C-alpha cells in the first residue's frame, strides 16, 4: 500500500524522551484509535500498544522494573505472534478468506506487513528485545527472524486485496509505534545498565562479607575489574568451566551461574564500549601525532639524493666539514640537525660495506698486534 501521509524519513529515526514518548502514545491512542479505526488500533483498556509510559510507572525503581517487565513480556508476545510462533499463519489467512472477526485481524496484520515502515518497526521491536535478553537466548530471536519472509508471504494476498483502503490512520500508527519503540529502547538500555551494575556490586559486597566471615578468598565471581590483557585468559578459563560442578553448590556461593556470567559479560562489554567512546577523540589525536612524527622523520627524496651524491663522492672520508654542512643546508633546505643525523645513520648503515673503513680497521689491528708481540 502507498504511504499516503508522506511523513519525513527523519521522524522514523529519531529517539524521543520519556515525555515525548508519552505525548506520542497519547496522540496515537486518542487521535488514531477512536471512532472507526481498525480493530488492531483499539484496545479495551484504552492503552496504546499495551506499554506503560505514564509517569506513575517510572516514579520509583519498582515501578520502572514493573514497566520494563510488562513491556518485555508484551514485546516477546508480539514477536512470537508476528513470527508465526503463536501458531496458525495459514489458518489466519484461511479464516480471513472466509470472513469474521479473525478476518479483520488478519487483514490488519497484512496491511502492517505491507507498510513501508514495517522493516523499521520490526528492527526497532527486535532491538528492544535484544537488550534484556540473555546472551544464550539471542539465537532464538535470530531463528524467529529467519521466518519473517514466510510470514510476509502468507499475508501478501490479503495485503493486495486491501491496497485500496485509506492508509492515513495506519501511517500515523506505524510512525508513532516506531518512535515509541526507539524511545523505549533508550530507556531499557539505561535501566539495564544501571540495575546490572547494582547487581554486580551487590554480588561483590556479598562475597566480601563472606570472605570476612569465613576467611576464604573470593572466587571467580567477584566484581573486580580486569584489564584487556587478561580477557583472553578469562575466556579460556570460562571455556574450561564444567557446569556439573555446580550441583552441590546450593548456597549460591563459589562459581557464578550461567545467568550471572551472562550479566557480568554484558556489563563488562557496556563499560568497555563507554570507555572507548569517552577516550575515542584522545586516541585519534595520539594516533595522528604518531603518524605526524613518522612523516616528519622521513626526508624528501630529492634531498636524500643530494646527500647520497656527496656521500659517494667522499666515500673514503664521509665526514663533512662545517663548510660542507652549510652548503648542504642551502642546497637541500634541511636543518643542520637533520643533516647530522642523516650522516650518522648513513655511516652506521655502510660501516661494514665501506672498503676504506674496513681497510683502516684491519691496518690498526695489525699494528696493534705487532706492538704487542714486540
Swiss-Prot record:
GO molecular function, one term: DNA binding
SUPFAM superfamilies, alphabetized: Homeodomain-like (SSF46689)
Major place of residence: nucleus
UniProt key word DNA-binding: yes
Keywords of the record: DNA-binding, Homeobox, Nucleus, Transcription, Transcription regulation
Subcellular location as annotated: Nucleus
DNA-binding region coordinates: 291-354
Region (Disordered): 214-242, 347-374
Domain ELK: 270-290
Family: Belongs to the TALE/KNOX homeobox family.
Free-text function comment from the UniProt entry: Isoform 3 acts as a transcription activator, but isoforms 1 and 2 do not.
Protein name in UniProt: Homeobox protein knotted-1-like 13
Organism, as annotated: Oryza sativa subsp. japonica (Rice)
